[in-house]
Amino acid sequence: MTEATLTPPAVPRLTSLSHGGGCGCKIAPGVLSELLKRATPPALFPDLLVGTETSDDAAVYRLNDEQAIVATTDFFMPIVDDPFDFGRIAATNALSDVYAMGGKPILALALVGMPINVLPHETIAAILRGGESVCAEAGIPVAGGHSIDSVEPIYGLAAIGVVHPSRVKRNAAARAGDVLVLGKPLGVGVLSAALKKNQLDAAGYAQMVATTTKLNRPGAELAALPGVHALTDVTGFGLLGHTLELARGANLTARVHYASLPWLAGVEAFVADGVFTGASGRNWAAYGTDVRLADGLPPVAQALLTDPQTSGGLLVACAPEAVDDVLACFRADGFDRAAVIGEMVDGPSRVDVA
């Protein structure tokens, strides 16, 4: 842990105050889709380059021919018990959506909901400091925010970034023949479930915090590469869910090579022991009909592939000739587990895993 926990022993664990943690507490994708269908369709705005059409990572609004604004918000309940780490993870996760659009963050606003009569002010202050530390690392200020007294602890950011209109990377622009590259290892949801069950050791906790607090800064550089066609980040809907968004947006089939997927240490063993989040099942129920799992995959495959990631890695669809540059971009920023995991091919809008 990077800062001593400030809560006294009598104070409840942060994770005990929430019914779900991190991106695992997202509304299930099927329910969210149904809710959005019932919403009033937005008016047409010619300068709104990216809205809700393809469930992309952030909204993008063109100011002029040289500049567009990237706007997003993300918040959730605690995924860890250390308040400083919770703040860091939530802030890193929120900024990721700006990077996933190819943008550069310029400022953030804090979104804070806390059970004021349950948590000491020192604990809440540590959460805020954690978020501020990540924003400082990203080179941006926390310029304000909003707070409420809530039943469960909630923290996150509204993040604003900038991007050149020609460099906006949507999740619906993959092409047949593109190679899929993933920036971070998978399994955060499994580790969070193990933590909540008191089964995660210090080494497991350290790797969980390390991956969830690593900023997806390569996004802006990746957007500048001519061979990069589509970009998103893997979060609450799991690898399958976000890969399926690429496939649906491009009307293609995404082929994922299970043996090539990078995993955080220990997650396969945890799942084999029945330790994973309820969100995995909800994710599969929402989109499993559009996924084909090959015979011979390990029994843990479905739970791992649907595992909700908090502050997960960037998922890139790029031309084959751009793969080396994409991997070099990741490696230069310390993403040493970045890996080629599949490709986009002609076919129905689905994900095939073999």
Curated annotation (Swiss-Prot):
Site (Important for catalytic activity): 26
Active site: 23
Enzyme Commission number(s): 2.7.9.3
SUPFAM superfamilies: PurM C-terminal domain-like, PurM N-terminal domain-like
Organism from which the protein derives: Burkholderia ambifaria (strain MC40-6)
Range of residues in the leader sequence: none
Complex and partners: Homodimer.
GO molecular-function terms, A-Z: ATP binding; magnesium ion binding; selenide, water dikinase activity
Reactions it catalyzes: hydrogenselenide + ATP + H2O = selenophosphate + AMP + phosphate + 2 H(+)
Name of the protein: Selenide, water dikinase
One GO CC term on file: cytoplasm
Names of required cofactors: Mg(2+)
Annotated ATP binding sites: 26, 54-56, 74, 97, 145-147
Cofactor comment: Binds 1 Mg(2+) ion per monomer.
Entry function: Synthesizes selenophosphate from selenide and ATP.
GO-annotated biological processes: selenocysteine biosynthetic process
NCBIfam families named among the record's database cross-references: PRK00943.1, selD
